[in-house]
Structure formats: structure tokens, C-alpha cells
Amino acid sequence: MIAVQAAGCAPMVRAWEAGDEFAERWEGAATMATGIRVPKAVGDFLILRAVRESGGAALAVDEEAIMEAVKDAARLDGMLLCPEGGAVLAAWRQALDRDLVGRDERAVLFNCANGNKYPLANRARRMKLAEMDAAGL
């Protein structure tokens, strides 16, 4: 099991890396992935215990990696991930790079919401539509 947090709010990752049983509150929490912007988890000790007992890890991913993962999932798989789901995909990539997960292993990635609840891409980057006379088709 791998716990995933945004680098701008990663109290569980910090506690896991320090070997602590409880996570200290993260001050100045900031991430586009609002669903994982949790400065102080109520069940921190349960999460840390589950990660340790599973032989897992806790990983933090930066905002750039989150957005890259969201874009890649849309472009390559046709999936509209929420930023939280992008964080999970980015962490999976990080886990592969660190050999925490084998490339031949089966992994389950959770996308806990939908990209529709977040603002769409910048309008200036969308396709340009032209008016057309449909009768002439």
C-alpha cells in the first residue's frame, strides 16, 4: 500500500519518513488537489500503521507531476482524472522509478473523484470554432 500526498501538504509522508506514529499538523498546506489537502488527519496513526504493515511507502508528488499525470490520462487513456487521481498516477510513476513497485506487478490506482468538479482548461487553449452554414453541407 502506498499513501499519496501532494508535496504542498504531506504530513503523512513526513511522519512515515521520520518513523513517527502520529503526523504533526502541516502548516501552510497548499495544493490544487483539494481532496488531499488535509493538514492533520484524524486517523493518522491508522494510515501509518496500514502502510507499514503492508510493507508499503508514503510518497509526495509535486503540482507539476500531478498536472502532467492528469493530462497524460486524458490524452492517452481518455480519462478525466481529478487532481487527486493525478497525484495517485504521479506517485505510481514515482514508485516505479524507485523500484517500490515492479513493472510486471499489478497495481490498483484509485481516482477518488472526477475531473468535472474542477475548472476546465484555459479557454485560450481550446479549439477554435468557426461559424458555418449547415445548409451548404
Language model: regions and residue ranges:
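Active-site/ligand-binding loops adjacent to catalytic centers
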Residues: I2-L81, A124-L137
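Phosphate-binding loop/pocket of nucleotide- and phosphate-handling active sites
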Residues: E24-E27, A87-L137
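A glycine-rich, Thr/Ser-enriched phosphate-binding loop motif common to dinucleotide/cofactor-binding enzymes
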Residues: C82-G86
